[in-house]
């Protein structure tokens, strides 16, 4: 019927010899360049068409070659191992939900390869065999390098948690657990009774020790208390005595050097001894008195003699 109508049979197009492969595109363009020039009559148009078609043809060739390589890798016997090592690398440090998704992808791919995709044999492509083996080994080493810091961190955290747990619990606060993991009420009561008994025994021992110390050192303690109470507190003089000394100072502020008779009368008035009176006047002169420039030299001489006498 096709021949009667002037058409060629479809069987003529089924032969590989009649099909054009992507690699034949370039030769076809080169062989027809002259015809295109004659057909269109313009060199610029031919150049424009060639520059537009060549990238598309090269892209088609690259895509075709990439598809062929992918199909070869996917049908290789080592592809399941390659996928396994790749997923193991992705699972290092990944959250639990991401790890589950990766495992599901691996199971689905395994089912697809088993039921649908045919596998090639070793030796069919030695270069691809070497590539697959090398890449699998690289991924295994990469996974080991990735997992090392995570394993070290996990070990360190577990060690710290154990130390903290030991510090928080300790042997003194450790309690016995029942079969269901809870502390039984009977054991709690017994522990409370033991603690109360220990406290009572400790208080009784303290009282006994205190009584023994009082019986043995009571007299010494009493004598020490009496001796401490007799000692006068060091520091400021009594208020009345200090006021009497200040009154004498204000009257004799031009020459605040009391005579021996003045000291005796001040001692009788204040109840202080000679040493306390001398010390008070020495400190008072150092802090609050400065000799006048118009003071006679003979008074200065007398003051120096009195000062050294004190």
UniProtKB/Swiss-Prot annotation:
Check the UniProt entry and state the signal peptide residues, or none: none
Database matches in PROSITE patterns: ELK, HOMEOBOX_1, HOMEOBOX_2
Alphabetically list the UniProt keywords. DNA-binding, Homeobox, Nucleus
Is the keyword DNA-binding assigned to this protein?
Answer: yes
**GO molecular function (one):** DNA-binding transcription factor activity
Cellular compartments per GO CC:
nucleus
Q: Where would you find this protein in the cell?
A: Nucleus
Q: Which SUPFAM superfamilies match?
A: Homeodomain-like
Which parts form a coiled-coil structure per UniProt? none
Which body tissues produce this protein? Expressed predominantly in shoot apices of seedlings, in the receptacle and developing pistil of flowers and in axillary buds of inflorescence stems.
Note the SMART domains from the entry.
ELK, HOX, KNOX1, KNOX2
Record domain ELK: where = 208-228
Q: Where along the chain is composition biased (Acidic residues)?
A: 185-197
- Note down the stretches annotated as region Disordered: 178-208
Q: Does the keyword DNA-binding apply?
A: yes
Question: Biological process (GO) annotations?
Answer: cytokinin-activated signaling pathway; specification of carpel identity
* Residue ranges for the DNA-binding region feature of this UniProt entry: 229-292
Q: Which family does it belong to?
A: Belongs to the TALE/KNOX homeobox family.
Q: What does this protein do?
A: May play a role in meristem function, and may be involved in maintaining cells in an undifferentiated, meristematic state. Probably binds to the DNA sequence 5'-TGAC-3'.
Outline the subunit composition. May form heterodimeric complex with the TALE/BELL protein BEL1, BLH1 and BLH2. Interacts with OFP12 and OFP14. Interacts with BZIP30.
- What's the protein called, per UniProt? Homeobox protein knotted-1-like 2
